[in-house]
């Protein structure tokens, strides 16, 4: 007589026990000061953010710049010659970048509805708020953000970092250097520069007369140093460097 058997059953919850995932960590933004910058914890990431580039951005926005920097000011005139532009700190630029990474998953992948809702809430929170936490019902998290879904979400963020590293530094060879995304009421542009990634957020207004959308002159921008993302990317360390991709002496940042 044939009998039921559990001979090949997998051990129970081995992965979850060994990894010890904190699913609520996606709903918390922990920022702490460190030497020369900040440490940010979100999800299963720990980012070490230096205060790199802030002084340079403020110099470029002033009128007292060396002639070699004028080309950079002209190229990004809506940032450096615009009285309505504002410089944000690197940890806020990183927050915007992470919000875009989640939004990229939400828009491009076939996510199950409940999981998509959580990704949407998290991305909107990162993009539109500066609070340290967002309340998501524990029941909702338990049902739709399982340990497997958590891993998928974090892997998607790493894939977005990898996508950023395929960009070339701003160049005159026509090679792609930016990722752009339009959301409700705002446009976000992430551009690769010598020092890392320039993140800009522009509001989209609606003309009262005709209902057409136009980009507002108000823009907020900041710089995320390359090292912040590189330690979490999967770029092969031994791959040959493309100088167009990694450096351009014609731009100041």
UniProtKB/Swiss-Prot annotation:
It is found in: Virion membrane; Host cell membrane; Host endomembrane system. The keyword Disulfide bond does not apply. Keywords: Host cell membrane, Host membrane, Membrane, Viral matrix protein, Virion. InterPro entries: Filo_VP24. One of its GO terms (cellular component) is host cell endomembrane system. Its main location: virion. It comes from the Viruses. GO terms for molecular function: structural constituent of virion. It is a peripheral membrane protein. May act as a minor matrix protein that plays a role in assembly of viral nucleocapsid and virion budding. Unlike Ebola VP24, mVP24 has no measurable impact of host dendritic cell function. This is Membrane-associated protein VP24. The lineage of its organism: Viruses, Riboviria, Orthornavirae, Negarnaviricota, Haploviricotina. The gene is VP24.
């Amino acid at each position: 007589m044939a009998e039921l058997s559990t001979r090949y059953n997998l051990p129970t919850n081995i992965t979850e026990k060994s990894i010890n995932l904190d699913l609520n960590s996606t709903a918390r933004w922990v920022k702490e000061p460190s030497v020369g910058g900040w440490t940010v914890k979100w999800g299963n990431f720990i980012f070490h953010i230096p205060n790199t580039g802030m002084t340079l951005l403020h110099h470029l926005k002033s009128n007292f710049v060396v002639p070699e920097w004028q080309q950079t000011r002209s190229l990004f005139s809506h940032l450096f010659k615009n009285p309505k532009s504002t410089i944000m700190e690197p940890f806020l630029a990183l927050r915007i970048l992470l919000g875009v990474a989640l939004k990229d998953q939400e828009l491009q992948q076939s996510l199950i509805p409940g999981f998509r809702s959580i990704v949407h809430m998290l991305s909107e929170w990162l993009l539109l708020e500066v609070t340290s936490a967002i309340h998501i019902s524990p029941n909702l998290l338990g049902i739709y953000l399982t340990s497997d879904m958590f891993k998928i979400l974090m892997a998607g963020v790493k894939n977005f970092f990898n996508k950023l590293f395929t960009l070339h530094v701003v160049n005159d060879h026509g090679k792609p250097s930016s990722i752009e995304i339009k959301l409700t009421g705002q446009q976000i542009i992430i551009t690769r520069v010598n020092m890392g990634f320039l993140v800009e957020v522009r509001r989209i207004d609606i003309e009262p007369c005709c209902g057409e959308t136009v980009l507002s002159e108000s823009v907020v921008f900041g710089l995320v140093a390359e090292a912040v993302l590189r330690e979490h990317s999967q770029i092969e360390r031994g791959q040959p460097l493309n100088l167009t991709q990694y450096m351009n002496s014609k731009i100041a940042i």
